[in-house]
A protein has these predicted regions:
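A conserved short coil-to-beta-strand element within the FAD-binding core of flavoproteins
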Residues: 1-11
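Glycine-centered loop/turn positions within well-structured domains
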Residues: 10, 21, 37, 93
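Short beta-strand segments that buttress and anchor functional surface loops
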Residues: 12-16
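Core beta-strand elements of the Rossmann-like FAD/NAD(P) dinucleotide-binding domain
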Residues: 18-27
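Glycine-rich, N-terminal phosphate-binding loop of Rossmann-like dinucleotide-binding domains
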Residues: 32-33
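Short, well-ordered alpha-helical microsegments
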Residues: 36-37, 184
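C-terminal catalytic lobe of FAD-dependent flavoproteins
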Residues: 43-95, 100-320
């Protein structure tokens, strides 16, 4: 909530459940997404930041709409590309996406009825069965924090990332604009390279050949990895084991611990979500709420009834407050 620049360091004021505290750092990396301009405003009080162009992208989820494990790309009538992807074990189809200029509250981003109609109509041009808003079982939306290159059409705004490192008046602040998940690793290495002069002891880049947490599967052979898991945990139902293996990779053994039966995984909240997995997510992936677990860390909300979701929320509240 506060930034103060000095010749060789920054003082940042952080606010959390336990109040405020001040920390010091030699540099600030401003990777705040849609809030990057607000952070720059803290770093440079009194200046007006207008570096971002916010573009909303929304998706709809419908029951499985085509056979096979294929993803499809469609050319929409307005020239945009749409896609339909098998989703959540192939039980659903994910259809996206939209490009809508956005100036509303970034904390409350939701799909509009016009976007739902747009996606249904666009996909229906290619499916034998038309998709209607009544078929939509879930939606999600996000705001793309794109660098404002002053393109007239929201779909034409650059998706490339832009880095801006400012050392005016003291310690550096590196701001990240735009970018996509497909370039996140390269972006991160580029950011560190920009800060190299400020950290002479920085090591050389190493992430290109490094696995993500849980991704160090021998030979990158998932099916062979799954067979090994089945041998180590013969008591587990294969559908559940496959989901956990896909979600957690080599970390699945840490999640399962010493369990020798499904009963030892603890309470079953529905949809194959057990207490052991919830506890793992709370301890290792910062999950605090039912929404964290059912939507942000997974998409299991699609498989739980409303009463099951409510039971999970109640259980979590007790755990967090204990």
């Amino acid at each position: 909530v506060g930034l103060a620049r000095h010749a060789d360091h920054w003082e940042a004021t952080l606010r959390g459940p336990e109040g405020e505290k001040t920390v010091m750092a030699r540099a600030v990396v401003n990777a705040a997404g849609g809030w990057v301009d607000e952070i720059l405003g803290l770093a440079e009080p009194g200046t007006r930041q207008q570096n971002l162009r916010l573009v909303k992208g929304s998706h709809i989820i419908v029951p499985r709409w085509h056979e096979g494990d294929y993803a499809y790309f469609f050319q929409n009538g307005d020239g945009r590309i749409m896609f339909a992807i098998p989703y959540e074990r192939g039980e659903f189809t994910l259809i996206g996406t939209t490009d809508v200029p956005y100036e509303a509250d970034k904390d409350k981003v939701e799909i509009s009825q016009d976007e739902i109609a747009y996606l249904c109509a666009g996909a229906s041009e290619y499916y034998k069965r038309s998709i209607t808003p009544a078929d939509v079982v879930a939606t999600y939306s996000g705001v793309r924090p794109l660098y404002d290159d002053h393109a007239a059409n929201a779909s034409k705004v650059t998706r490339d990332y832009v880095l801006n490192c400012d050392r005016t008046g003291g310690a550096p602040v590196l701001s990240v604009f735009g970018g996509k998940i497909t370039t996140y690793r390269e972006l991160a290495e580029h950011a560190l390279k920009e800060l190299g002069p400020d950290f002479p002891g920085m090591t050389k880049p190493w992430t290109k050949s490094a696995s993500l947490p849980g991704g160090d599967i021998p030979g990158a052979d998932f099916e062979d990895f799954l067979r090994g898991l089945s041998l180590r945990h013969p008591w587990m139902e294969q559908r559940l084991l496959r989901r956990l293996a896909r979600a957690y990779g080599t970390r699945v053994d840490a999640l399962l611990g010493t369990a020798k039966s499904t009963v030892e995984l603890g309470r079953d909240f529905g949809g194959g979500l057990h207490e052991a997995e919830v506890t793992y997510l709370m301890r290792h992936e910062f999950a605090q709420t039912a929404e964290d677990i059912l939507w942000r860390r997974s998409k299991l909300r699609l498989h739980l009834s409303e009463s099951e979701q409510a039971s999970l929320a109640t259980w979590l509240e007790r755990q967090v407050s204990a």
